[in-house]
Curated annotation (Swiss-Prot):
It comes from Pyrococcus horikoshii (strain ATCC 700860 / DSM 12428 / JCM 9974 / NBRC 100139 / OT-3). It holds the Pfam family HTH_24. Signal peptide: none annotated. It comes from the Archaea. The keyword Ribonucleoprotein does not apply. Keywords: DNA-binding, Transcription, Transcription regulation. One of its GO terms (biological process) is response to amino acid. Disulfide bonds: none annotated. PANTHER family: LEUCINE-RESPONSIVE REGULATORY PROTEIN, TRANSCRIPTIONAL REGULATOR AZLB. This is Uncharacterized HTH-type transcriptional regulator PH0140.
């Protein structure tokens, strides 16, 4: 589980940021290509990437998949209201479901917010009425379905 707001902040210099920007552009870019583009030795790039992984700045290297092209028609955002004493327990249970892409405790009108990706409306219904319904502590949910995508990004490096 990621605990971003309360994690120790890692100091990033311009070389770190340049490496991160290039890896976000193309996660398969070789260290030698990164080295060439930012004009530092390849050994520096390798050491920096290893440090960024070790310190948790780079969580993992993965392909960014377009869910719609991969046969998943529904991306939904679900706000959850939970019993105050059970919020953390509810989050731990929700985190176990493969349908959940992003999950966190939030401020505002709801306690928990998540993004889920499923193949169709029937699978979304099963997720809410069968899987989520079994979790003790959930009081109510509010679901919004993404109808179009204007931007699908990832964490920016300034």
């Amino acid at each position: 589980m990621i605990t971003v707001p309360h994690s120790r902040k890692v100091e990033l210099d311009e070389i770190d940021r340049a490496i991160l920007r290039l890896l976000q552009e193309d996660g398969r870019m070789s260290y030698s290509e990164i080295s060439r583009r930012i004009n530092v030795p390849e050994s520096t790039v390798r050491a920096r990437v290893n440090r960024l992984v070790k310190e948790g700045v780079i969580r993992k290297f993965a392909a960014l998949i377009n869910p719609f092209k991969a046969g998943y028609e529904i991306v939904a955002f679900i706000a959850v209201d939970a019993e105050p004493a059970k919020v953390k327990q509810v989050v731990e249970e929700l985190a176990k479901f493969p349908e959940v892409d992003v999950l966190g405790i939030v401020t505002g009108a709801h306690d928990i917010f998540m993004q889920v990706t499923v193949k169709d409306l029937q699978e979304l219904e099963r997720f809410i009425l069968e899987k989520m319904a079994k979790i003790d502590g959930i009081k109510s949910t509010e679901t919004s379905i993404l109808t179009s995508v204007k931007k699908w990004g990832y964490a920016r490096v300034f």
